[in-house]
């Protein structure tokens, strides 16, 4: 991923937040990574939201929720951060319009002006629960779903798209690039997030109008792509190479990646971090595919009465689930039976976790496994320990990172996932306090921060993590944990 004029983007984001920032930036060429080494604090807790006239989208229902939650929270910094973070996707990344008489919403990931299927599906997710209270919000969400289906039908192998046939920074990649694509990294979860979003939108609003011919084409393409990437026959439906200094931005073996044994699992050439997989059966993403396919089958049966496609979804979900039970576990000497992060069907296992969702830690958050599943609980203990090579602990906090940013950089997303999947109030409290204490005084979440210095962080404007933080706080309030939040000092 390339972000031109990246230092200017950081400055612009800082101005958008109403902050004065001095920073020395470390830039990785053709990557979105910026490490800002110092952020200056402003007085008190003045809102860092854009001025009302500069907000891209405003929802009355969201504003009502912000006021409600702020009144309940006595921790002023937490209330301030919630107000900054929860509407961040709406106010800074949502480009809503009407195309051919139907809602159409293009969602930037933040500092990169492209739409990731994963990020966009996660960014607007917490607003679905409010859609029945706000017709305009409902239309905006409908527009995201329709845009995602269109993107899938342009190319189901792509992870990120342009707003129009503009071309972009990665047109020279050795893969079947198109001008509509920002990037063409094959990641299973890119096709799962739209299914998760559309299903929940339907359940919350009762609106089935999005499941039209575009939807049928999209789910047909999703099934075709998943089956191709089981690699039971041809292995070259998808190839990817890039001239780069980052080993995880390209695939070995002439663009095919490491070999797999066709045991029923689905290849994911890249992770949700956009880094290449080591062993190409990415376990959390295969679990996500199972739950997403079952949601699609329910839609196809109930709304479309398309029993043929529904059965294909169900059959594939069962095949992948059976293969996961057989090949995705590992008998760890310390933790017992756990899920591996990646496998290849030949008996090899990669034992680690990455912060990006879907992750092993996040499987219970996504609903892919039961939170009380003993294998999941063993895995959860493993990934939040020094036995996970990408778990870092320092003076500022502890959590999971990944090779996308590298050593000692903790992703707040992992701390949020620990809180989302926790059944222990003290653990939840510790996670929220850590998130409050590692914002570097900005009032926002960042992509990652250094384990010993939260002012050393990457990406000043990363809407997914901001909205996810808002989702977490809203969930805790709605579950009656306001007193727990207010006990945080």
Question: Model-found features: residue ranges?
Answer:
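Bacterial Sec-dependent N-terminal signal peptides
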Residues: 1-25
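Low-complexity, Ser/Thr/Pro/Gly-enriched N-terminal "stalk/linker" regions
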Residues: 25-118
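Acidic, low-complexity proline/glycine-rich segments
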Residues: 37-51, 249-265, 487
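Well-ordered alpha-helical scaffold segments within catalytic/enzyme domains
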Residues: 61-74, 122-135, 193-208, 287-306, ...
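Extended, well-ordered alpha-helical scaffold segments
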Residues: 81, 135-151, 207-227, 296, ...
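Aromatic-rich carbohydrate-recognition surfaces in CAZymes
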Residues: 113-141, 145-248, 463-477
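Extended ligand-binding clefts on enzyme/binding-domain cores
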Residues: 117, 153-157, 161-164, 170-179, ...
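C-terminal capping/lid segments that line or modulate ligand- or cofactor-binding pockets
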Residues: 173-179, 184-187, 350-370, 408-489
């Amino acid at each position: 991923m390339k972000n031109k004029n990246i230092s200017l983007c950081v400055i612009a984001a800082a101005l958008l937040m109403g902050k004065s920032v001095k920073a020395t930036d470390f830039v990785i060429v053709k990557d979105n990574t910026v490490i800002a080494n110092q952020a200056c604090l402003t007085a008190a807790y003045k809102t860092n939201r854009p001025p009302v006239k500069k907000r891209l989208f405003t929802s009355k229902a969201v504003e009502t929720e912000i006021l409600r939650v702020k009144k309940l929270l006595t921790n002023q910094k937490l209330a301030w951060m919630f107000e900054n973070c929860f509407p961040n996707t709406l106010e800074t990344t949502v480009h809503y319009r009407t195309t051919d008489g139907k809602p159409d919403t293009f969602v930037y990931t933040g500092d990169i002006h492209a739409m990731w299927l994963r990020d966009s599906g996660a960014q607007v997710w917490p607003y679905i629960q409010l859609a029945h209270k706000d017709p305009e919000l409902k239309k905006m969400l409908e527009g995201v779903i329709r845009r995602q289906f269109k993107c899938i039908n342009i190319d189901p192998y792509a992870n990120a798209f342009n707003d129009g046939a503009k071309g972009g920074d990665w047109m020279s990649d050795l893969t079947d690039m198109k001008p509509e694509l920002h990037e063409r990294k094959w990641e299973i979860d890119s096709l799962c997030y739209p299914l998760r979003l559309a299903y929940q939108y339907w359940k919350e609003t009762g609106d089935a109008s999005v499941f039209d011919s575009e939807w049928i084409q999209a789910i047909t393409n999703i099934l075709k792509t998943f089956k191709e990437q089981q690699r039971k026959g041809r292995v070259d439906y998808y190839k990817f190479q890039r001239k780069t200094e980052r080993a995880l931005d390209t695939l070995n073996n002439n663009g095919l990646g490491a070999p797999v044994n066709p045991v029923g699992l689905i290849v994911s050439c890249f992770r949700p971090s956009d880094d290449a997989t080591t062993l190409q059966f990415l376990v959390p993403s295969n679990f996500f595919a199972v739950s997403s396919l079952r949601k699609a089958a329910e839609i196809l049966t109930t709304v479309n009465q398309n029993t043929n496609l529904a059965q294909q979804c169900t059959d594939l979900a069962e095949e992948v689930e059976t293969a996961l039970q057989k090949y995705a576990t590992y008998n760890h000497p310390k933790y017992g039976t756990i899920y591996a992060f990646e496998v290849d069907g030949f008996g090899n296992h990669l034992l680690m976790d990455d912060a990006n969702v879907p992750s092993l830690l996040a499987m219970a958050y996504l609903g892919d496994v039961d939170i009380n599943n003993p294998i999941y609980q063993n895995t959860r203990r493993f990934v939040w320990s020094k036995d996970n090579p990408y778990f870092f602990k320092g003076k500022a906090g502890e959590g999971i990172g990944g090779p996308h940013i590298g050593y000692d950089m903790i992703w707040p997303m992992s701390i949020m996932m620990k809180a989302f999947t926790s059944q222990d109030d003290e653990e939840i409290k510790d996670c929220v306090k850590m998130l409050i204490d590692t914002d570097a005084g900005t009032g926002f979440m960042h992509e990652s921060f250094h384990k010993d210095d939260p002012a050393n962080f990457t990406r000043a404007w990363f809407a997914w993590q901001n909205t996810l933080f808002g989702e977490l706080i809203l969930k805790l309030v709605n579950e009656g944990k306001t007193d727990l939040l207010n006990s945080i000092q």
